[in-house]
Curated annotation (Swiss-Prot):
Cellular compartment(s): Mitochondrion outer membrane; Cytoplasm; Nucleus
Chain positions of ARM repeats: 111-151, 153-192, 233-272
Gene: Armcx3
Mitochondrion found in the keyword field: yes
InterPro entries to which the protein is assigned, alphabetical: ARM-like, ARM-rpt_dom, ARM-type_fold, Armadillo, Armcx_regulator
Family per record: Belongs to the eutherian X-chromosome-specific Armcx family.
Record's subunit section: Interacts (via ARM domain) with MIRO1, MIRO2 and TRAK2. The interaction with Miro is calcium-dependent. Interacts with Sox10.
Name used for this protein in its record: Armadillo repeat-containing X-linked protein 3
Function: Regulates mitochondrial aggregation and transport in axons in living neurons. May link mitochondria to the Trak2-kinesin motor complex via its interaction with Miro and Trak2. Mitochondrial distribution and dynamics is regulated through Armcx3 protein degradation, which is promoted by PCK and negatively regulated by Wnt1. Enhances the Sox10-mediated transactivation of the neuronal acetylcholine receptor subunit alpha-3 and beta-4 subunit gene promoters.
């Protein structure tokens, strides 16, 4: 009896394993008819700058990056970070089998392959899963599929026409941080489209609140910042974030380097809009902001922050803002820039260990600041 029972358990295990592998194969294999249908709707290439005219600082765009791929799109392999922030929900004894299955389909699941592109009918089924399911692992897998398909320009219109925007946005109310992150990634990829942005603007306040209250440096916080960065590449919806600029400066001061750089991309979009100059100057900044200039390891952060300050200085009109100076409170960015010479002295001092490029940039900015924004004749 003992031997027969063992044989039975082994047989059951083989059947379950074969079934799981077959399901993975069915989900990832390419269909020729899908390929032909998608060829009629578009090339399938990820668009570079999105459909928004006048795009500025899209998410993940770096000055020294020569890649032609879109920097505002987030791509996830179908098996990526399932379950927990460290990896998979599968129990330890199943990890070996899961790894073998992932390796088997890895070649077929790449962002450059049409095998991962779903037809409108399949996208409708995935959206139904997102709308009806309450199980986190199902929601996560479905959102990963949606996010990967939203990386293609023609699919952004299809998902919108299928009513996908409010369905995905509803997931932002979940308490599961992993599911929420995946929902933000889907919305981020969909937001590289003018019509989608127009419809997503109603969720900006919620995304902003979730972003500033999330755990510092968490994946949810970074995903929210990326979405807000994409939503502010044009001037049209920037005013929605006017009351949250102080919170962004707080995140900038407290966050790690990755968070700092992501906040800077968002603030740079705002700083390039003259209509947001007064809102930026009115924002409260932490007293620790000045100490950033004491740390030479933050060279890239300092240089990008100086670009933001230069844009604010260039957009500042003394004649219009002189009567409003009394409306800028102590601790605001206006007063920080007014006392910026203190930070500059630390960078330009004899004992400074800063890079030569940083020293030159700070020196030029102080000269511009004194000439335009705070002329001595007006003090």
């Amino acid at each position: 009896m003992g031997y027969a029972r063992k044989v039975g358990w082994v047989t059951a295990g083989l059947v379950i394993g074969a079934g799981a592998c077959y399901c993975i194969y069915r989900l990832t294999r390419g269909r020729k008819q899908n390929k032909e249908k998608m060829a009629e709707g578009g090339s399938g290439d990820v668009d570079d700058a999105g459909d928004c005219s006048g795009a500025r600082y899209n998410d993940w765009s770096d000055d020294d990056d020569d890649s032609n791929e879109s920097k505002s799109i987030v791509w996830y392999p179908p098996w990526a970070r399932i379950g927990t922030e460290a990896g998979t929900r599968a129990r330890a004894r199943a990890r070996a089998r899961a790894t073998r299955a992932r390796r088997a389909v890895q070649k077929r699941a790449s962002p450059n392959s049409d095998d991962t592109v779903l037809s409108p009918q399949e996208l409708q089924k995935v959206l139904c899963l997102v709308e009806m399911s309450e199980k986190p692992y199902i929601l996560e897998a479905a959102l990963i599929a949606l996010g990967n398909n939203a990386a293609y320009a023609f699919n952004r219109d299809i998902i919108r026409d299928l009513g996908g925007l409010p369905i995905v946005a509803k997931i932002l109310n979940t308490r599961d941080p992993i599911v929420k992150e995946k929902a933000l990634i889907v919305l981020n990829n969909l937001s590289v489209n003018a019509e989608n942005q127009r419809r997503l603007k109603v969720y900006m306040n919620q995304v902003c609140d979730d972003t500033v209250t999330s755990r510092l440096n968490s994946s949810v916080q970074l995903a929210g910042l990326r979405l807000l960065t994409n939503m502010t590449v044009t001037n049209e919806y920037q005013h929605i974030l006017a009351n949250s600029i102080s919170d962004f400066f707080r995140l900038f001061s407290a966050g790690n380097e990755e968070t700092k750089l992501q906040v800077l991309k968002l603030l740079l979009n705002l700083a390039e809009n003259p209509a947001m100059t007064r809102e930026l100057l009115r924002a409260q900044v932490p007293s620790s902001l000045g100490s950033l200039f004491n740390k030479k390891e933050y060279k890239e952060v300092i240089l990008k922050l100086l670009i933001i300050f230069e844009n604010i200085n260039d957009n500042f009109k003394w004649e219009e803002n002189e009567p409003a100076q009394n409306h800028f409170s102590e601790g605001s960015l206006f007063f920080f820039l007014k006392e910026f010479q203190v930070c500059a002295d630390k960078v330009l001092g004899i004992e400074s260990r800063h890079d030569f490029q940083v020293r030159v940039k700070v020196g030029k900015f102080v000269a511009k600041l004194t000439e335009r924004m705070f002329p001595k004749s007006q003090e």
